[in-house]
């Protein structure tokens, strides 16, 4: 009798579990969000979380997903890869989330992706650009461009638009994002007839770059690539100018933070970086997002706020189109996403689950203003020329 009762209880438990995962069962859509709310990339994590929360609130206010409200389970990984893995493990083993959004940094997404993949829970990163992220499995997606595309755009811009023939590069050897970009930038610049005359390395959090910059200055580069994060780039720019290095600095989307100019100041004038969008784009869709974000958070949204907002909306749209809350059904709906009208551009996932979308090249001008120097599509063709200068984005407030 006891065995029969236990069997019945087990069967009941399984049926209830199925009911909760079926589109008609349960009353919440549970989405795990892991971001760097503190630590070295806190600015990125905070603005990304802001974008995700705003997207969820908009969908919930409109009735939710197929009548169900979205429940965000937001966790701070403290900018640490091992903590990111721990959080995602909890998401899939204890919280039983239906989908996962995160992380901002490639190294942390790479640490977490195998866990989501093994659990067959779809994970969508809004801003991890290292190609290795989506290679972790067919449940892993990204809604941003990838480093080979971004790196090629950076190198092409230096060679074609700036006319540089000699280049040097500063790379964070312990950062997947930085090393991934370095390889593509160097290879593309060389392929286009340029010469890489010097390479120097540093580690995130370093304060003194004088030895590396002294070496690079002696190589007489016409441009210096710095594929790193804003907190290091600002210091590198200041110390480069102090050493009399006047050539343009060029980097990637890791530069995008108001803290960049707060750290580097006028040393950044005449520098350039690739990005996912511009908050000064006149597209009504972009301006609505910017105005809504400003009204809610009191600041202009940076690119990672926009990519995270898009990622959340894309995930919610896929869940709506899925036949159930089963992970495979959501994964299949995500993979079928085509021309989703995001604020960072129309998004389509290719066969590698990477987003196909445009890139903008931002120029930093005196007074901390930004302008769009040109737009580049995934094939690398220039789409548009200069746009009017506009103020740099303000720092995002801490999320409550």
Give residue ranges: language-model regions.
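Short, low-complexity disordered leader/linker segments with a strong preference
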Residues: 1-30, 61, 379-400
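Beta-alpha junction/loop-to-helix N-cap segments that form part of ligand/metal-binding clefts
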Residues: 21-23, 27-28, 43-48, 58, ...
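Extracytoplasmic "Venus flytrap"
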Residues: 32-53, 75-82, 104-105, 170-179, ...
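An alpha-beta-alpha
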Residues: 37, 140-204, 223, 315
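Hydrophobic alpha-helical segments within soluble ligand-binding/sensing domains
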Residues: 84, 143-166, 179-181, 207-210, ...
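Extracellular/periplasmic bilobed ligand-binding domains
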Residues: 116, 182-274, 384-385, 389-399
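Extracellular/periplasmic periplasmic-binding protein-like sensory domains
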Residues: 237-309, 320, 325, 364, ...
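Segments of small-molecule ligand-sensing domains
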Residues: 295-305, 316-370, 392, 397-400
């Amino acid at each position: 009798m006891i065995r029969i009762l236990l069997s019945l209880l087990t069967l009941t438990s399984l049926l209830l579990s199925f009911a909760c995962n079926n589109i008609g069962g349960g009353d919440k859509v549970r989405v795990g969000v892991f971001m760097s709310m503190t630590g070295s990339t806190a600015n990125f994590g905070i603005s990304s979380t802001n974008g995700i929360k705003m997207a969820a609130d908009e969908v919930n206010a409109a009735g939710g997903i197929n009548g169900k409200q979205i429940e965000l389970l937001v966790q701070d990984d403290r900018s640490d890869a091992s903590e990111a893995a721990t959080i995602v493990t909890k998401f899939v083993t204890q919280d039983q989330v239906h989908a996962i959004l995160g992380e901002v940094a490639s190294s942390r997404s790479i640490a977490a992706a195998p866990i989501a993949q093994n659990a067959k829970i779809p994970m969508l990163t809004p801003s991890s650009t290292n190609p290795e992220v989506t290679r972790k499995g067919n449940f892993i997606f990204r809604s941003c461009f990838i480093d080979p595309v971004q790196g090629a755009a950076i190198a092409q811009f230096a060679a074609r638009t700036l006319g540089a023939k000699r280049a040097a590069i500063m790379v964070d050897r312990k950062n997947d994002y930085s090393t991934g970009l370095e390889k593509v930038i160097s290879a593309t610049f060389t392929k286009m007839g340029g010469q890489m005359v010097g390479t120097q390395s540093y580690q995130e959090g370093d304060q003194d770059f004088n030895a590396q910059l002294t070496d690079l200055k002696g190589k007489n580069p016409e441009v210096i690539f710095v594929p790193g994060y804003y907190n290091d780039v600002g210091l590198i720019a200041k110390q480069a100018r102090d050493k009399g290095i006047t050539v343009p600095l060029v980097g990637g989307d890791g530069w995008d933070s108001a803290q960049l100019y707060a750290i580097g100041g006028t040393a950044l004038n005449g520098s350039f970086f690739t990005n996912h969008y511009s908050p000064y784009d006149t597209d009504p869709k972009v301006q609505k997002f910017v105005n809504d974000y400003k009204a809610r958070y009191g600041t202009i949204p940076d690119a990672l706020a926009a990519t995270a907002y898009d990622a959340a909306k894309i995930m919610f749209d896929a869940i709506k189109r899925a036949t159930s809350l089963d992970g495979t059904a959501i994964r299949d709906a995500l993979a079928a996403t085509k021309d989703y009208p995001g604020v960072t551009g129309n998004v389509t996932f290719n066969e590698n689950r990477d987003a196909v979308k445009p890139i903008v090249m931002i120029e930093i001008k005196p007074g901390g203003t930004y302008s769009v120097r040109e737009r580049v599509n995934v094939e690398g063709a220039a789409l548009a020329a200069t746009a009017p200068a506009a103020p740099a984005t303000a720092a995002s407030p801490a999320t409550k």
